[in-house]
Amino acid sequence: MTASELLDLAWSYPLFEALYGRRSRRFGLGFEMPEGPFRYKSAHTPVPLSEIEEALLVGAGAGFSGLALWDLPTPAPYRRRSGRTFPTTRPGGHTALFFTNDEGLYVLDANVAASKLREIETPDERTKVLEAYRAQRRELRRGRLDIPRHILPMSGHDLWDSNRPGSTLFLPVCDVSASLISLIAQFVDPALRRYAPAGGGMNIVDDRHGCRPAGTERWLKDGFLDAERMLPLSIVERQACYYVFSEPATICQNMFLATEALGLGGWKHCGFLSLEILERMGFRIVAANGGATFGNPVGLDGVFEASCPPYCPTMDAAVDAVFSQTPREATAPVPYRMSDGEHRVGAIRISPEGLACTKAICNYIHDTYGRFPGGTDAMHLMWVMQAHHIDTDYYDRFFGPGAYGPAHAAHMATWHP
């Protein structure tokens, strides 16, 4: 089959068939389960995923789907409005997709501008998935990422099958720092019309230090913040994590459903010490200080960097970067029929007092805890998704009909004739 025919085949797979057929199929070609009731050694050699298979998985998990609508009464003035195949609280998202296979370690370039409302509208445009994969894939190093095969960083029940030859392991890494800065501003500044009541912003207090003001004394005194509306800092940081953690989870689930459509095996897993994996990926770990127990993974230089020092000289600069109002290119496409002038009428922007208060809180966190965020890491690797070719002999031996579907049965003949 041609690439176009394979794309059409993947596109035609029914969504609800994928939802109800989805299973964790952990045993791949060339794998060995050394113990237990399903002890088995594959008689086949591993077969790596093809370029088009990886492209479809990447496109399903973290593809750029077109212009985000932002159909809100108070639209945000984002320069880019690129929608993704996963839901996110800002265009482009807070998550970078890394992946490793037998050939190397890669990252998907997220600096992509949407060209129209729906990037893929016709069958002829489905080749964009493959074109985007080729254009956005950036090689970071040669060879498979070496993840130590012991507890931790791996879970004990995944030692035998995770990151094996022939597999592709997808590692979505999310950034909490920018989310936290944005969320702090939304809690303190009524001008943003999010979580700060019109009568005064929330009084963010440090509940890990006796509920003292988190650097906000000036704004409490002048009434910009409502002293009676106390909000613990730990809850704000937790909420910032909630905002972001849904992204990698959805990326993995999208890929999981795509494996069903393509007839591949795989599963989403976690339960590891991500700090060690991030370090092996080349992430910068800022040494613990100010009472912190562990170092803070803040980014991969020049690839994916948190909104905090050392990538920003100060927390003031980090806040400014998050709220920088870079004008949208005059020729950039928009999803709406109205003029840009009409659209800007409802746009919201942080107020000068809100910006100053946000900076004060962020500086308090960094100065008090020696890191930003204070109670969690800047970068997180919560889940990974592995895809591989299943060994149907294994499933035929141990399981009844239905252990895998028609797409799995026909996969090698269809995709690797």
Language model features with spans:
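Acidic, surface-exposed loops and disordered segments
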Residues: M1-P417
